[in-house]
């Protein structure tokens, strides 16, 4: 039985999307800066669905500048779920120094939901 061909940047389960080289100029040390990165890079992708909650992990280099991202989960209008293993797997596969977990709220209300707080606790515990 033949093994599948190796394709850099992908596995059978994970696809990590590299960002433009100039995206590494983004300073992502504040929530506002991460929001700008989301709007300029992630939301600009043709496959982005702004009417659904989307969880994205952004991989960062040693200067905490983004160089890749992975859509962890696509949900509904009001919710999206993600497990720590789904979040950490692409981070480890990409060899990231650091990461930021981001998601949108289609409602436009940035207040964290109970589900947001619960996943934050689970990730901190992991």
Regions found by a protein language model. Give the residues of each.
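Active-site-proximal loop/helix of nucleotide/amide-processing enzymes and allied scaffolds
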Residues: 1-23, 59-63, 73-126
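Glycine-enriched loop-and-adjacent helix/strand subsegments that border the catalytic/binding cleft
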Residues: 22-65
């Amino acid at each position: 039985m033949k093994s599948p061909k190796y394709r850099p940047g992908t596995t059978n389960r994970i696809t990590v999307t590299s960002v433009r080289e100039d995206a590494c100029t983004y300073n992502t040390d504040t929530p506002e800066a991460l929001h700008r990165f989301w709007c300029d890079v992630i939301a600009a992708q043709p496959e982005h669905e702004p009417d659904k909650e989307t969880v994205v992990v952004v991989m960062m280099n040693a200067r905490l500048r983004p160089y890749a991202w992975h859509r962890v989960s696509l949900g509904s209008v009001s919710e999206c779920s993600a497990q720590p293993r789904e979040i950490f797997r692409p981070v480890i596969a990409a060899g990231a120094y650091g990461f930021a977990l981001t998601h949108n709220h289609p409602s436009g209300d940035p207040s964290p939901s109970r589900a947001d707080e619960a996943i934050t606790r689970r990730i901190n515990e992991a």
